[in-house]
């Protein structure tokens, strides 16, 4: 790999390490609430090793190595470097790598799925390892995987048969995408939900589905049979269920939730925790699904939580979930504003560009809250969440939206933002946080929350008039496709689904944010149109920041595989293309001050005409969004793929010219140092916070001895 190619994989130096500030919100809880939050926090973080195993085979050993080195020198890294003969600069490089590693819970970026490697030379890491026998033993297990791979494809997560890395299919280097697809369809047919599974291909060519559970023989199972003979191209082979994947961790999680249940604050929480315990002890996704039914009924709790194998972005097939869990406190002041948005939703949704037949018969008002996060376990912390992901619960029972306030407000050092014109920097700095809050609210509440899937819910039963089907607004013809019995949005759209849905939700936000009555709900303006007032500034930055995100997205596109590595960023690139194609010079990219096409792109800037948002920007978004939505609603995968591939295609100018400049100017993503809680005898629960530094990040995990 040449130096230029290698540079994009080097660990951030320095990483942007910030505190997830929580103290005043935690201290406002009473003793019972603190204990409830404490045990949920511990349950969530007890899954850390699951996250590590879900990233790469070497991640768990690297994690242990970082903590072992810290313990061996009692956190005095300068002394460790001196005794190992390693310079202070190289020790700093190791600490920078360690902070990014722990912040991503593995050695592939949680946002982008590309590997990052230390800047410290390998012989210096070996020297650090030699200072401690346990560290040296660990080092020998991962030293060949710490740095760049000989095959560039292995620098990215993805399907093994495409040369990429995926530990959702452990010890199975020759497993094919067709085999993954075939077995996924079989499991769906048998009624086994795949979120809490991994799959291994054995040397004999048979398949083992590894189910996460605290026991190897659960008292009850979601499906009766555990062994299946295969047919078709795999005749003679078999598939069997193997319980007890992540057994130690699942037992710890179940034990902590058993303790949390003792402090549940109402009956919904009591029932929810009971289902969580069954889900993780027995490996039951059916129980997890039931936990979410109780969770959505627990409206506006003082202590909010969710936990499980939730998001499926990182499984290349898009069906297996990553471990995730959080404990958080409600921010009542911010939640009031979001509550008004929820109440106004029935008036806002009809403004979207599709007929009523493509919308739910009744909007299920979600619980929309702003949270201050105590703990978020997983590979990265989002700014907002819309769950559960189970289609039938979302369609028929409801869902919750949460905005993570202290994630949104976590401050990084102020500096000029790449690709923004000098004359836009001040308004961008002033409005980027409010604009992002508007975007997150609309994205999560109305974006993910709106829309109907046209379904044959069971043989011969439909959730629309099949005798007189609605007109497809894209084709002008009657609808001719829909979801068949047993099909879900995820099963039909597969690996493309997560990015496509994020694009749909982002587009809903772009469609609705030009509505000044909505901006007023968030506290901007009086509802009257004024593109040059405060509300107009927020609207302008909603659009400008989306265009900028589309350029920045190229960092997450791999030129070798020509593959997107991050669902949200692929979506934002598509929306930037919508802006660029809107016409009328609404949005243009200027290569240099004199617009010289042959200039280097160090002065590349976005020109977006705020006055043309209502005349060019929003109409272009609406036309794009209508197609996205209708293709999803009608299960039209072929049309959706052709359409989405067009907008997410990276041409040679973006690949060869723009992308290298994006990488050169890229700012490190934040990694968050989170507090710990400890039971303190009769004094209740102690909250311990740490400094925002690589050393503080490592210390916070060293003190989680239960992991």
Which ranges hold each PLM region?
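Eukaryotic N-terminal low-complexity, Ser/Thr- and Lys/Arg-rich leader segments
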Residues: 1-8
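Zinc-dependent metallohydrolase catalytic domains
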Residues: 8-11, 33, 42-43, 49-119, ...
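Mature N-terminal segment immediately following signal peptide/propeptide cleavage
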Residues: 14-42
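Soluble non-cytosolic domains of exported or imported proteins
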Residues: 16, 27, 31, 56, ...
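Solvent-exposed, polar/charged alpha-helical surfaces in well-ordered, non-transmembrane soluble domains
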Residues: 27, 34-39, 60, 64, ...
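Short amphipathic alpha-helical segments at helix boundaries and their inter-helical linkers
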Residues: 41-56, 278-291
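Contiguous, non-catalytic segments that form substrate-binding/exosite surfaces or channel walls
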Residues: 95-98, 102-218, 225, 236-436
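Short active-site segment of divalent metal-dependent hydrolases/proteases
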Residues: 442, 446-447
């Amino acid at each position: 790999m040449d130096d230029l190619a290698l540079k994009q994989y080097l660990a951030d130096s320095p990483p942007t390490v910030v505190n997830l500030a929580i103290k005043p919100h935690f201290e406002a809880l009473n003793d019972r609430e603190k204990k409830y939050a404490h045990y949920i926090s511990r349950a969530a973080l007890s899954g850390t090793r699951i996250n590590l195993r879900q990233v790469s085979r070497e991640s768990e050993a690297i994690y242990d190595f970082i903590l072992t080195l810290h313990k061996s020198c009692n956190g005095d890294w300068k002394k460790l470097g001196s005794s190992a003969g390693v310079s202070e600069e190289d020790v700093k490089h190791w600490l920078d790598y360690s902070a990014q590693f722990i912040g991503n819970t593995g050695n592939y970026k949680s946002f982008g799925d590309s590997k990052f490697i230390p800047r410290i030379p390998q012989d210096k890491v070996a020297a650090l390892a030699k200072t401690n026998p346990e560290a040296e033993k660990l080092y020998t297990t991962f030293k060949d995987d710490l740095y760049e791979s000989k095959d560039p494809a292995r620098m990215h997560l993805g399907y093994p048969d495409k040369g990429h890395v995926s530990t959702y299919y452990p010890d199975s280097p020759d497993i094919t995408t067709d085999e993954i697809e075939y077995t996924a369809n079989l499991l769906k047919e048998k009624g086994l939900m795949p979120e809490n599974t991994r799959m291994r291909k054995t040397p004999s060519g048979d398949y083992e589905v590894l189910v996460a559970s605290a026991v190897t023989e659960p008292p009850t199972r979601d499906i009766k049979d555990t062994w299946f003979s295969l047919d078709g191209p795999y005749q003679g082979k078999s598939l069997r269920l193997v319980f007890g994947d992540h057994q130690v961790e699942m037992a710890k999680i179940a034990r902590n939730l058993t303790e949390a249940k003792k402090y549940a604050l109402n009956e919904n929480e009591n029932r929810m925790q009971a289902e969580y315990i069954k889900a993780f002890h027995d490996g039951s996704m059916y129980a997890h699904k039931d936990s979410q039914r109780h969770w959505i009924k627990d409206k506006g709790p003082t202590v909010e939580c969710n936990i499980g194998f939730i998001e499926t972005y990182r499984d290349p097939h898009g069906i297996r979930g990553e471990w995730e869990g959080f404990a958080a406190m409600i921010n009542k002041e911010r939640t009031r504003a979001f509550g008004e948005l929820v109440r106004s939703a029935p008036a806002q949704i009809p403004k979207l560009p599709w007929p009523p037949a493509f919308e739910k018969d009744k909007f299920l008002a979600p619980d929309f809250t702003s949270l201050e996060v105590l703990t978020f376990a997983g590979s990265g912390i989002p700014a907002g969440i819309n769950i559960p992901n189970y289609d039938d619960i979302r369609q028929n029972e409801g869902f919750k939206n949460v905005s993570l306030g202290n994630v949104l407000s976590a401050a990084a050092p102020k500096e000029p933002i790449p690709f923004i014109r000098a004359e836009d920097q001040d308004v961008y700095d002033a409005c980027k946080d409010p604009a992002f809050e508007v975007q997150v609210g609309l994205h999560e509440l109305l974006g993910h929350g709106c829309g109907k899937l046209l379904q044959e819910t069971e043989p011969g039963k439909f959730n629309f008039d099949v005798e007189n089907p609605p007109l497809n607004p894209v084709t002008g013809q009657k609808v001719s496709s829909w979801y068949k019995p047993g099909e879900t949005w995820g099963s039909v759209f597969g690996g493309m689904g997560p990015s496509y849905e994020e694009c749909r939700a982002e587009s809903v936000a772009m469609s609705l944010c030009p509505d000044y009555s909505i901006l007023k709900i968030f506290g901007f303006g009086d509802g009257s149109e004024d593109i040059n007032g405060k509300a107009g500034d927020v609207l302008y930055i909603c659009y400008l920041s989306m265009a900028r995100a589309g350029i920045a997205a190229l960092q997450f596109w791999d030129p070798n595989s020509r593959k997107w590595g991050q669902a949200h960023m692929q979506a934002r690139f598509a929306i930037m293309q919508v802006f660029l194609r809107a016409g009328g010079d609404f949005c243009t990219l200027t290569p240099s001050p004199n617009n010289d096409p042959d200039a280097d792109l160090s002065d590349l800037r976005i020109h977006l005409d705020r006055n043309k948002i209502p005349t060019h920007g929003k109409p272009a978004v609406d036309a794009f969004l209508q197609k996205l939505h209708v293709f999803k609603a009608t299960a039209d995968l072929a049309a959706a793929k052709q359409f989405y591939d067009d907008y997410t295609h990276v041409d040679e100018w973006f690949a060869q010219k723009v992308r290298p400049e994006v990488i050169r100017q890229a700012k490190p993503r934040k990694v968050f140092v989170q507090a710990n809680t400890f039971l303190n005898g009769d004094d209740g629960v102690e909250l311990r916070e740490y400094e925002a530094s690589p050393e503080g990040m490592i210390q916070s995990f060293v003190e989680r001895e239960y992991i």
